[in-house]
Amino acid sequence: MVLTARQQEELQLAVHAYLVEAGHAEAAAAMAKSANLGDDAGDAKYTGLLEKKWTTITRLQKRNMELQAEVEELRSSARAPRSRTTTKMEEWVPRPPATVAVDGHRLPITAVAIHPSFAVMASASEDASIKLWDMESGNFERSLKGHTNAVNDIAYDREGNRLVSCSTDMTIKVWNMDNFTCTKTLSGHDHTVSSVRFDHTGDRVFSASRDKTIKIWELATGYCLQTLQGHSDWVRSIDVSADGAWICSASSDHTVRVWSVASGECKHVWSDHEHVVEHASFAPLVAHEALNLMIFGSKPSAEAASKGPFVASASRDKSICLFDVSTGQHLARLTGHDNWVRATAWSRGGRYLFSVADDKTMRVWDIATKRVSKTIPAHNHFVSCIAVHAKNTHVVTGSVDLKVKVWECN
């Protein structure tokens, strides 16, 4: 891999800082002269940078070895005969206590996101910052600063190369995860921007706002391609289907809507909640089997089974609703929380739906039976957000208690 000119300069400055710190002043001076480092040599921000990069490489090498071992284990499992006693992935649920608990934000946590490949998590807060953490050790990595008011939502693209954020400052920012710089700021909403997502290609960003609209942005140009209107109040949450064809939205107008990305038309409006709808998300394909078991009571034939997509919504009416986009049906209402339900996330195996609420708990719902299978006292205050790692066994929650917690599933 060839370093860019800027990367070469940063490496030279980091080596220079290391030599100075190690007491090799003559070698440092000779290097500064040879490399023509100029006034940047001696800048305090480069002190310790070489050691940090070295430990990061070591950690990534270790993680790479672990992933290779996991792949080999999965291959061996695939070749081995199935056993009745083998714990299947669809049965994995979070187990207390949390394996990691970090704090560093000065105000409540509003959103969490997990890197799709690495053991890195991001947290957003009302303190206007985004922080990156090592999920396994809990070590703080860095802060992303640029917003001037509360950061309300964050999301990685599919590869984890970029992070998108939105804020009460009415802007959306796109961050490069290689150098942790803001590469694009999108402006156009007239009020708080409450939710953001990349599309499946990473070429577009979708945003929802208190100005009652949803916007579709082209990242290459920064232009707003389309504005979707229909909600009569604050649009609090959006999600994009896996194929990029649909958007679902949740609003303070008590409705959940599904929109066609191609046409911008609203396909369904569900008014089944009795209070503000805080969150809406699409079920992954792996959850369709459990959802069809719930619909039919037993496994349906391939022809009869609903192909979805399916939507889950969380509301201040203390309930979670499930919807079928293909039929427009309201499938079920899940009740059990004792306070506002803030967010949901699907288990990797698809059998369970996880939810967090102002009753300070995380609950695990068996979708096929529509019952709570586990209640976990998660935080000491309202639990505001949840995310599930796409490739390993971690669940992350964030809270008004200023803590981000990592939970192991088994």
Curated annotation (Swiss-Prot):
Question: Which compartments is it annotated to reside in?
Answer: Cytoplasm, Cytoskeleton; Cytoplasm, Cytoskeleton, Microtubule organizing center, Centrosome
GO terms, biological process: cell division; establishment of mitotic spindle orientation; microtubule organizing center organization; microtubule sliding; nuclear migration; vesicle transport along microtubule
Q: Which residues form the LisH domain?
A: 7-39
Task: Provide the residue intervals of the WD repeats.
Answer: 104-143, 146-185, 188-227, 230-269, 294-333, 336-375, 378-410
Q: Which GO terms describe its cellular component?
A: centrosome; cytoplasmic microtubule; kinetochore; microtubule associated complex; nuclear envelope
User: What InterPro entries does the database record attribute to this sequence?
Assistant: Dynein_regulator_LIS1, G-protein_beta_WD-40_rep, LIS1_N, LisH, WD40/YVTN_repeat-like_dom_sf, WD40_repeat_CS, WD40_repeat_dom_sf, WD40_rpt
Name the protein family: Belongs to the WD repeat LIS1/nudF family.
**UniProt name for this protein:** Lissencephaly-1 homolog
